[in-house]
Design a protein with these regions (language model features):
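Long, charged, glycine-rich C-terminal linkers/tails
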Residues: 177-193, 284-307, 465-467
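Conserved amphipathic alpha-helical "coupling/scaffold" segments
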Residues: 1-154, 158, 263-266, 270-284
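Conserved small/polar residues in nucleotide/adenosyl-binding loops
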Residues: 628-635
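C-terminal helical "lid" subdomain and adjoining coupling/linker elements of P-loop NTPases
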Residues: 85-92, 504-607
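SMC-family hinge/dimerization module
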Residues: 190, 194-225, 235, 297-320
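Intracellular alpha-helical coupling/juxtamembrane segments of multi-pass membrane proteins
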Residues: 158, 162-165, 241, 245-280
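Extended, Lys/Arg-enriched charged tracts that mediate electrostatic binding to polyanionic substrates
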Residues: 160-203
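ATPase nucleotide-binding head domains, primarily ABC-like/P-loop NTPase cores
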Residues: 290, 298-527
Length: 639
């Protein structure tokens, strides 16, 4: 990676975006790794990185963000333990922190949520939790300065004896400091500790009146800290207990160190994987913070940013831009007013390309794509060097010379106010020649300029496109909208007129401008007016289209409702017709059965009074039932 490329990364402020990324990581190691990220020129690698970021976004959406707290680089400590070294409590706590983070990550991966396979699965599958060792360390070590009594039964026993012995010594010394015979020689009636031994503070002039061992003297020399002879044996026993305690603590630390060394390789792997996962999820959290999307990655030279936003410009004031490069043109000439957004446009193109090459989602709309460039070069900003006595023009030219030495077909070159700060005619000629050189190298180019000659150059040259940052002459304010295919026009006369400059002065100024320039600006003005009229017509057409769609939706809803009600009525009618059919069928069956019985009785010679009339009535009922049955069937057929 050459020096000029590194300078361009700085000018495009990639480091500031990486700093935002680092803010979304918790461990210092992950923050450092985020800051060390550099763009990749491998399209497959970039796609894989972006896929990882997207997968992490999905995980966060479904089941929240995992915790990576307690991650420390414990490799050196594990290596020392492997060689037989005894680790400090702080080192062991850091190892336990990695083990806890590994267990939590494993639990996160195995929890409910995302079901389908993900590129993150390989990372999570490499993690192995060791809850036994994790809890063993945390239960044994309370802090970097304190070992728990529960670390071993022997340590608990020793400390119990220490407390008992300390109480015994204090009790004996308490008798001395409360004795009236010693009241005059004591500086204070207290028991204190010096060199792990209990002592009492005695006035310097009375030190010979209390038999014992002197362990310390106050800075003023007025107080001697004396261990009375009656406490020597007790203090000796206490000292032996302290030595036994230290020995037991060393044994415990050595044991925990050895156990950690046994799992050295897995703990190292866990740390590496967790660190990578933390950086991936930091990328995902940044994506949410920026409302970013995963762009398409191309290698055919085509870049297309839809409603892209510069990630370092926050608030409601940011105006999205849509810009493309490499489809029907490989060079973009951007003109427009100062502070109108030209430089921001250049930076947005360059920075979003670099972000994607780092595996970061970009703040733009869906459908955006970036092209993979091996190097992105930018000549942006005033780098005038007083020490080198370089003018602004010379400083930029020196920078451009270095860029031209290394740019090629895999480069994106961004020029801000190309060849400004010198004679306009010569500056414009130089600018065109520099752009042509880059184009012959096959590089993609975007340049901002005030030179009218470059507008004409773009209009006459195949593969070169004009663009402009819109300016509202009525409000005298830039709108920050980027207009592809529309060259920027000079607004000096219009602005001066609105600000109240005398008409006579304006007319004289116009007469001093060449007729060709006047005609060119008039053409640009007409084009701009036509563009605005077309945009208004387009907006009106869009409004009418939306209204038509809204009316169509209402009509569709109305007809759907009518159809639903009709179907509901038909279903009810079918139910009623079916009920009539079923009822008629039951009635017919009853009539047939009764008629059958009458015929059977008549056949047997039995006399049935009124049987003829009864049979005739039954036949009429049967005919009525048949008619009802037929009409119900016809109704069902109609439905």
């Amino acid at each position: 990676m050459n020096e000029q490329y590194e300078k361009s990364l700085s000018k495009l402020e990639l480091d500031k975006v990486l700093s935002l990324l680092a803010d979304h990581a918790s461990s210092q190691a992950a923050k450092d790794r985020c800051m060390a990220i550099r763009p990749s020129a491998d399209a497959d690698e970039i796609r894989h990185l972006l896929e990882e970021t997207s997968a992490a976004c999905k995980c966060i959406t479904i089941k929240g963000s995992p915790s990576f707290g307690g991650l420390y680089d414990v490799g050196a400590s594990l290596d020392r333990a492997y060689r037989g070294g005894c680790l400090s409590p702080e080192e062991l706590l850091r190892i336990a922190g990695v083990l806890r983070a590994a267990r939590q990550a494993k639990s996160y991966a195995e929890g409910e949520g995302v079901q389908e396979a993900s590129v993150l699965d390989l990372y999570f599958q490499q993690i192995t939790s060791n809850k036994y060792l994790e809890e063993r360390i945390f239960n044994s070590i309370l802090s970097k300065d304190e070992i728990a009594d529960a670390a071993s039964s022997e340590l608990a026993s020793i400390r119990r004896k220490i407390r008992q012995q300390s109480a015994k010594i204090r009790e004996s010394l308490q008798k001395i400091i409360t004795s009236p015979s010693y009241a005059k020689i004591l500086q204070e009636p207290i028991v204190t500790i010096r060199s792990d031994r209990f002592v009492v503070p005695v006035k310097a002039e009375c030190k010979g009146q209390l038999p014992g061992l002197v362990h310390d003297v106050s800075s003023s020399g007025s107080t001697y800290f004396i261990e009375p002879m009656s406490a020597v044996n007790g203090n000796n026993e206490l000292r032996e207990l302290f030595m036994a305690e230290r020995k037991e603590i060393e044994r415990i630390l050595a044991e925990l160190s050895a156990e950690s060394a046994d799992h050295r390789e897995q703990i190292k792997l866990d740390y590496d994987v967790l660190l990578e996962l933390e950086c991936i999820f930091a990328r995902a959290r940044l994506s949410f913070a920026m409302r970013a999307i995963c762009p398409e990655v191309r290698t055919d030279g085509q870049l297309n940013l839809i409603r892209a936003r510069h990630p370092l410009i926050t608030g409601k004031t940011v105006v999205p831009i849509s810009v493309r490069l490499g489809s029907d043109f490989d060079t973009l000439i951007i003109t427009g007013p100062n502070t109108g957004g030209k430089t921001v446009t250049l930076k947005t193109i360059g920075l979003l390309t670099l972000m994607a090459e780092c595996g970061l989602h970009i703040p733009a709309d869906d459908g955006s794509s970036i092209n993979v460039y091996e190097q992105v070069f930018a000549d942006i900003g005033d780098e005038q060097s007083i020490e080198q006595s370089l003018s602004t023009f010379s400083s930029h030219t020196k920078n451009i010379v270095e860029i031209l030495k290394v740019c090629d077909r895999d480069s994106l070159v961004l020029f801000d106010e190309l060849c400004a700060g010198t004679d306009p005619a010569e500056g414009a000629a130089l600018a065109i020649a520099i752009i042509e050189f880059c184009r012959k190298c096959g590089a993609g180019v975007a340049a901002t300029t005030h030179y009218a000659e470059l507008k004409l150059y773009a209009m006459r040259t195949s593969g070169v496109m004009n663009a402009s940052c819109e300016f509202n002459v009525e409000t005298l304010q830039p709108t920050y909208r980027l207009l592809i295919g529309v060259p920027g026009k000079s607004n000096a006369f219009a602005i001066s007129k609105r600000l109240g400059l005398d008409d006579g002065i304006l007319e004289q100024a116009r007469s001093l401008v060449s007729q060709n320039d006047v005609n060119f600006e008039d053409v640009l003005t007409q084009l701009d007016q036509q563009r605005q009229e077309m945009e208004k017509a387009k907006e009106e057409a869009e409004r009418l289209r939306r209204e038509t769609e809204k009316q169509k939706e209402k009509s569709d809803e109305y007809y759907a409702q009518i159809k639903q009600e009709k179907e509901k009525a038909a279903q009810q009618a079918r139910k009623e017709a079916q009920f009539i059919i079923d009822d008629a069928r039951h009635a017919a069956d009853a009539v047939y059965e009764e008629l059958k019985q009458l015929r059977k009785q008549a056949k047997n010679g039995a006399f049935i009074p009124g049987s003829n009339e009864k049979q005739a009535g039954m036949r009429r009922s049967l005919n009525a039932v048949s008619y009802t049955h037929l009409r119900a069937h016809e109704t069902l057929s109609d439905l």
